[in-house]
Amino acid sequence: MKNENVNVTKLEDGLTVVTQNADFNKVFIGAWIKTGLINESDEENGLSHFLEHMVFKGTQTRSALQLSDYIEKLGGECNAYTSIEETVVHTSLLQDYWKYGVDFLADVIQNSVFPEEEIERERAVIMQEIAMYENDPTSEMFRFYMENAYKGDPISRSILGPQENISSFTQDDLRNYFNKWYTPENIVISACGNINHDEFVDYVRASFKKGFRETKFYTQKENSFKNIKAKKQNIFSQSQFIIGTKGITMMDSDKDKMTYTILANILDGGMSCRLFQEIREKHGLAYQVSLITHTMVENGFIGVHASLEERNIDKAIQLSKNVLSSVKENISDDELMKAKNSVTYGLSSKHDSCSSLATSNGIRALFGLDFKTFEETKELIYSITKDDVYNIANKYIPNEDSDDYCVTIMTPWDKTNEERN
């Protein structure tokens, strides 16, 4: 069913424009570009993220300072991020200034020039960013997990890229990657606020004038998840683990995805939920424990991350498997209703944010998914039964004695060893 508040228009050159008319005092406008880690060769690894930094560093008519001042003098904000499957450049402004937001995005997406001095400056910034994440225990744990769970797949690598790549990227590398992926048919402009769709489309059409360029899309390997056990030592003082297994994908049905969300909430929807109660409250095995889920176009995973003492790892891993498999049966009516209420509340909070709505619409348009109203989604949530949850649990979660998990463990470095792992 069509969401009456969301309108979609595909322009003649392939650019897609999505608007959601909603009663906010500000407007959020973003460009969703279908390129990220997954599109990069090994030699290009890190280019999507580097390019995300560079689009703010000068265009044919504006310097980096002029670009930021163009939005900030209006009280607005601009930012960007890179993920596995997309790069997003966005701005948020007061309602009356929405045309300035379109002008800004059109300029940085079409006219970035990548000055040499800015490349060198951002190269140093990204090197510091890499070092920062390498010194963050949770980031390093997640990176180690992805390296093993998706070994051999592009998504096993870091979005930031390796230092040797960052140190060698040239202006031509940035230009070539920019010209390859920042093309009309590969971009969605998504906006939310008090917006007239037709007026917005006409202004976007006039602002984005570049023609069609052929784009070669990367197809993700389906079900590239691997059941591997890996362990390494590191400089951090506390041990961690992530165990995970194949999860739902972005292309699965809305009902399956929502049932999966409810399942995840039953497991870890707060301090009274199963995972926290079993691992921390009942057994005291971990200071921090949480369910982790990640959904991609053709891949996904669900698992448990914990920070704990090394002596508790084996017991905590087994208990985590027990908790995960526990949702295959014996879900109480109270648990199910609590999860439904929690998921609905979270959904309601997103509908109170123009940035959340524009983001959801941008992703849905980029990957060809349907749009749903809040009421349609709420109706779906409360229609889900315990049997629906059991079916999804049995489809994705192995039995508690199964080895169908990727198990990754990080422990403090043993200083008695002569050499680090």
Which stretches of residues belong to each language-model region?
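Active-site SXXK
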Residues: 46-59
